[in-house]
Amino acid sequence: MIKNKIKNLDLSATLKINEISKNLENDGKEVIKFGFGQSPFQVPDQVVEELKKNAHQKSYLPIQGLYELREVIAKYESKKKNKKFTPDQIIVGPGSKELMFLLHISFDGEIILPVPSWVSYQPQSIIADNKFHWIETSANDNWYPTAESIEKLILKDKDKNYLLILNSPNNPSGQVCKNLEEISKIIKKYKIIVLSDEIYSELIFNVNYESIANYCSEKTIVSNGLSKWCGAGGWRLGYFVIPNELNQLKNSMKVLASETFSAVSAPIQFAAISAFEIDHSDYITKSKKILKGIGEYVYHNLKSNNVIMNKPMGGFYLMPEFLNKKFKTSTDMCSDLLNKKSVAILPGFDFGFPKDKMITRLSYTDFDGKNFMSKINLDTSIDEDLINKYAPNIIKGTKRLKDWVEKD
């Protein structure tokens, strides 16, 4: 009674590793949780207070989202990109993941996914019956596709519609896309649109934020939400910015929304206004300072002749490749690490890499972000002593990984 395409799917890898880690902890085992990509920081206090004030909100809100919320999101995106966006171009959903799913179902064409890509892009394509294509990338290109590789794929059948999904900063690599302008030139030439997943865009470390919407806004759907920069993953609030040129897609998504989630939780939407309306720059600066310090600590202490990876540029991920490990699959390798060292990381296979490539995703978020943030100032230097004091599992997990690499 189950469709074959659904039978072959597994639980989302990120959620699955979180459940496995929790089950091991419930059995009394200490697990270093480098597998689940959840923000370690608390939701800003002002936003929490707004949720308390709006707990009484009980009515269904507009399918597209509360107008006042869409208004502040439009202002936020307009300021961020130095472009004019309107509330009518915003659609709010119960997490950007759900909106991506509705987009996959609405879109009549084929999906282009860089290797690596976030774990849910491909399964959503399968569920929606959209053919998908993987595009290989390299560490030298920050794990993003070149404009030439995208064009080469499109030219195999340039009469089809294509949707390219770009995620910068990237999950799982922690890298930032540097060739957006070159990619945009290809986008403008062919029947292709872009989903720009910008959920980590407030967490870029050393470079200025840039969106492909700055180069081809008429063909770019921007995706964002509260889960990463605002620490509100469990609140489930995301949004799309859809250009007027793609109104048909927006209207189709509204129809699907009306037949699925109806509207996002009313208290959450009212509270979210303050997330975009109030200045949270100190909160974001401290978040980035901590994440950058921790990411660079893990990078410098784990990198070796046997472990290669790019230095993190944003978000909270590293993508180490273990050159001296000879397992049949990266999944087997991660199971070995969990069994021997109680460190949970995700195999690169879940992100589109060949199963025999010993590459992984490491999420350096296993610490109490609220406590850490409360102990630092804007000018505090994040050193090993601070990390050891307020993020001990980061130190412990890195040492266990090094020991596993060197001895096993």
Regions found by a protein language model. Name each.
Residues L113, W134, V194-S196, I345-P347:
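Hydrophobic residues in well-ordered beta-strands that form the structural core
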Residues I273, K289-Y299, M309-F322, M358:
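Conserved glycine-rich beta-strand-loop-beta hairpin in the small C-terminal domain of fold type I
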Residues L24, A128, I186-Y190, N305, ...:
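Helix C-cap/helix->beta junction micro-motif
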Residues I2-P94, F276-I278, D385-K389, V405-D408:
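N-terminal small-domain helix-loop-helix segment of the aminotransferase-like
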Residues L155, D336-A344, F351-D408:
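PLP-dependent enzyme catalytic core of the Aspartate aminotransferase-like
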Residues A139-V207:
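Active-site phosphate-binding strand-loop segment of PLP-dependent enzymes
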Residues E218-K289, Y299-L302, E384, T398-K399:
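Conserved core segment of the aminotransferase class I/II
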Residues S106-S125:
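Conserved PLP-anchoring active-site segment centered on the Schiff-base-forming lysine
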